[in-house]
Each structure stands twice: as structure tokens, then as C-alpha cells.
């Protein structure tokens, strides 16, 4: 943590926050007393104009007077007027607040909403928003169709926080950029494609990037009165390769002076002192805003259930700009490296079945300076109305238990807290709400609503001081985990992962990581997610070769002064390939089944996909599967794929990987036409989308969600039997091939020769609604038949 100087300005700060005229922030004229004033809204989450709101977020309101009648007066609609059904409102704090959730699941991502009040009554009259409907916008989807991951096909910068107008650009500001679509973060390099400069000189800064967001945190305070320029270069790309509109842009601001600053120490009191599951204590302290356990983060996920929560605790050291200079919009900062500690969680599958894993303490580390502002109340001008608080922070979640840390460790970028601040006696009390959406095992986005409550210590001169971080970070675990040097649980295209005990400084890692193959340097890219370093070799891991992954003590944590990492290395090798190469086969196809079917046996309109070629006449027929609207097509292959052989078709009948809409009749059923003794179906149009080619996996993501009930098919091309094979099959789009040049085998029941290809694999499916279930893709580990030839060869693991 940066060194913090305590200034004797806290009493003056408290007077300013209380709204006294000495700070220039109070209004003249008689004071309205609450009992005589009309009823007003004091707080809303989301606030008016808020962006990147989680689709799972509730609406939270707080009022000047408690409700006296029914609470069914909140109306929510999309910007085009479509109403959103709401569940029964939940009164909070004796009717001084409401919590309202959608009745039918989450809101739509990337959508603008309007919130109105109609019929909410208090003893002081009806409640309404003073400036008409409140509007907010949900965040983009992190998964699903490509069209849900962006507002536009052209890449644009939507906003920069602070903007220098409504939110002043300070000498301690951290810049947070938000774009109109997900980014290709590999195109972001600080000092090249993106930079912050003063008089043409690059400002040393930490860059964090994830999804549609980028954070630039200067390593040292900026110089007040100096102009700083943000430059975005033409090489920045969106996730589908879209270039930045206009070929780049520049914006500049003059840094304003925050000095002399005041340090306010706030405690984060526990909801309960109960040692086991404190957030579930029925007698625990509750948030004024939500009625839920204060300072607890309940994690709601299908994989984990909704009954677990972690309780946050710790001291927060907040630096405030000199408030007499900023009486209306008052900037503040929480330094990079600050830490909150969460309580232990006992992991349960689906919230019911114990997984035998406990997280230990969960650490929330600030990866950059958190930037915040105390703002005038947007709904009320009377002095008793609390001030609004907005805080933007980038944090890492890590777990004390290495087993849990490998699954939990991740970065949460640009988390926004929105709350109220009010002076209560000698304390400044803040209640705020924020949403965290951590990934669970990389399979599901969980939802957690943080009901934050902090209180300043009444005697700031004797408040706790920051505890210096003197612990050296260390390597907790790696993937792969090698036994006797043999890494039997990974495949050639897998990434390498190093999980550390705490988050590391990304700049320090640049010269600290190394990867060698057979003693020679192996090129790689790397990324940092929480306390996990993900290493991706440029070439897939080569079976049989020895690799060494190492980190040196050049890597450090985020403390000031920084603590170097304990050096560590791991050596491993994949099982060697034995014997001659054979044709690759399909391990899984989603949706559908990994076999070419007898087209004389299928009746797609009736939901009958026929039986596998080479099978018996009395074999079961396969069903026509359904694919939920937000899921991709995913295919896994037994051997490394030759990327040059995979071509996505953009018209009917083109490409070696085809995704097509099927021609249908007036009832929406696919139309069959005779083809000798078989039936064939016609393409209506190619489905536009993006095909991701990995070492052994093909994933197709459509531009738009699959339509409910619509008929689709996807086809993997190959060439049947040796007689039909041509030398250019693997480069002409005729067949999907392995790196060894063997064509895809799709009909194993026909007993083909080991090096033969197979017939085209055509799988029909119907679009279906989004489901709440979680799709878990499982890999077949090469524990025995490493070369995937269907035999246990002498020399393979366990058989040599």
C-alpha cells in the first residue's frame, strides 16, 4: 500500500460533509424539517443514467418517509415500451425502502430500461422521481451470441471515467475506459496501442483490461495543473476484429489539485460475530438499503446454489481531496493494494452436496486505486437528504486454500458501488450497493449483491494505522500437476496456469516468466487473472518433450514497497505418441451425436435423426436435439486439428465447417427431397457467426441467438474412403484434417481402415429458449490411448 500521511483536517471535513456554510456547500434560506416536507425519493440503485448494470440486479429504492399503503407501485419497462413483470416488492427498514426483482429471471443484456413510480404513498404524500422516469442500461453479455456482446459492429469508446466535467479529473485519478463491445485484449499494449502522456512523455501506469473495460492507473500522482493526454491507436480491435472508429482518438484533461488531503479511516463492521456462516445469522446486522446481511456477498449460482455468502471485514483508508475546494462533488481515493478479508465458505455442489472443499479466508485486493466521489443527492435538495456515493474499483478475489484458489482466483474489473453517506454523530456512515459477478469454474457467471456498510472511526487521531504487507507471494499450485514429471491430465492445446497466494504486479511479470522446451526458450503469451498467471505457448504442447515453466523473483506483489515472489519452477512432459498416425475421430459434438447417420433412416421433421451408419437395423434412432438460444456449437476431436483445413462457410454449401438454416414448409418443418434411397434437406441460408479453432476444439458462436423452434444444421466435411481422397483435401475446404494430414473419420461403426476419412457429418437441430442449466464441457483425458488409434500400444502410459 502507498504510504499515507494523516492530516489534522478531519473535523473540518466532517463539518463540510454535514453541509455547513463554511464549506460553501449549504443552501441559504430556511431549513425544511422532514415532518413538514413532501415525501421524496432519497436513493435508487441503479441510479439515473447508470450503465453496465448486471441483468440480475434488483431495483433498490429508499425514501424520506415510510410507505403507508401497498408497495406495488414500481413500473419497469424497456426503452421501446415493453413492460417487465416484477415480483412482489420487498419492503425494507420499516417501509423506508423497497427491493424489487424481475418476476421472470434476469433482464436482457445490453438493453435500456425505464423505471417509474406510480401509486407509492406515504403520510407525506405520493412518491415520484422529480425529473421523470429513471433510466439505466444493462451490461453487455459476456457469453452467448456475438450480437449480444456489443452495441455496434464498429468499435467505439463510450465513456471515460472521470470525464473531467461532472466528475473532476484529479491528480490522483485512475482512468477507466468503457467501450461499446467486448475487446480483443491482445491488441492492447500500454505505451503502444494505448497511452497516457504528459508533454509527450509516457506516464508510468498499470493497465488492466477485461471484457469491454480498460483501466489505467498511474503509478505516481499526477502533477496538478498539467495537461495529460489519452491516446488510443488504430491497432486496437474489438473481439471480432472491428477497428476503432476514426482510426484512433485522443482526449486530454488538466489534473486538478487535491491537496491538502485528509485520510479517513473507516471500519467495515461484521454482520455477525458468529464463527460459522456469519452471514446467515438471523440476529445479525442488516443493511438499511436491502435488508440483507451487511458487508456480506451472497454468491448465487446454479453450480453453487444461493445459500453461501462471504462476510467482508477490514479497515479502509480513504484519501479525500480538500473538501472546501470541492464542496459539491468531492473526490476520494482508496489506494492500490488495499485489502478486505472475507470469511470462509464451505463449497457445496448446487448448494446442497458438500464438495469437501473450504475456501479459507477470501481476500479482495484492490488492483488499482479505487476512485470515488461524494455527490449531491440527485433527488432532493433539502439538507437532511444523504449525499450520494459512487466508487469505482478493480479487485482480485483469491482464496486462502490452494484447492479453492485455483477455481476462484480472478479479476473483477470496474465494479461500481452506489450508496449514500451521512454524518451520524462523530461518524461518517456509508451504505452502498454493488454487484460482483465472478466466474464459477469457468462455466457460469455467478451473481453477488454486496450490501456495504462502513463507519469512520470517531477519533481519527487514534484510528488504526495501515498494516504493512511484508509477506512474499508464493506459488500455490500449477496446472498441469505432474507426477514423476508426467503430465497425463493435459492435452497439447491446453494453457499452463500458475496460481499464486496473492495478486502480482502485471508489469513485474514481463521479465519474470520463462518457458523452455527441451532446454530451449519456447515463445508464449501470458495473462493475469486475479492471482492466476495463464501461459499460452504459441505452439501446442508437443507430446514427449520436456517443458519447464518458471517464475523469478523479478515478479512482485502490489505492496509498497513491493515484495518479490519466491522463485519457483515446474518441469513436466506430456506422454509421447507411439506408432503411426491414424485418422482423427470426433469425441463429442454439441448438439447431437458424433456419428454420420444413415440418411435413409432419418425423418428430421418428425424429430427422428436416424441411426449411425454401420449400425444394425434395430439400433435406436437418434433424436433431433435442441440448442438453447445462448449456447454455441462445440465439437472436440481426438487429435490436433490442422487450422488450415477448417474453413467456415459463408454461403450455402461452402466451407469445411458449415452452419446453415434449413429450408422449411409453411409449418416450419424441414422439407425432405428424395436422393436415391435417401432423404436430403436444402439449405436456406448460411448462419453468420464466428468460428474459434483451438488445438482440439471447434466452437461456433452465431451473430444472433438461435431462434426458438427454427431448423438448423451444421456439417463437418470429410472425404469417404481412400479412393476418394485427393492431395489437396486438407487445404481446399473439402475436409477437416489433423496436423498429421489425416481426414476426419465420422463412421467408426463401418469398420474403416485406420487412415481413411469418412462421410460428411451433418447434424440437424432446433433452436430453443435460454435455459437456467449450466453447460459443462468435459474433456477425455489421454490416460491410456494417447495417440487415439483405438489400441493400447506398447509404450503408452500403463501399458509399456
Whereabouts are the PLM-identified features?
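Aromatic sugar-binding surface patches on proteins
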Residues: 94-101, 210-216, 430, 529-535, ...
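Extracytosolic secretory-pathway proteins
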Residues: 258-479, 595, 774-791, 795-800
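Short, solvent-exposed loop/turn segments at the edges of extracellular beta-sandwich modules
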Residues: 120-127, 236-243, 555-562, 722-748, ...
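N-terminal non-catalytic regions of secreted/periplasmic and cell-surface proteins
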Residues: 24-78, 109-114, 118, 125-194, ...
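Surface-exposed, short loops/turns at beta-strand junctions within beta-sandwich domains
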Residues: 104-111, 220-226, 539-545, 704-710
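C-terminal motif of bacterial Sec signal peptides marking the signal peptidase cleavage site
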Residues: 19-22
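Bacterial N-terminal signal peptides that target proteins for export
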Residues: 1-11
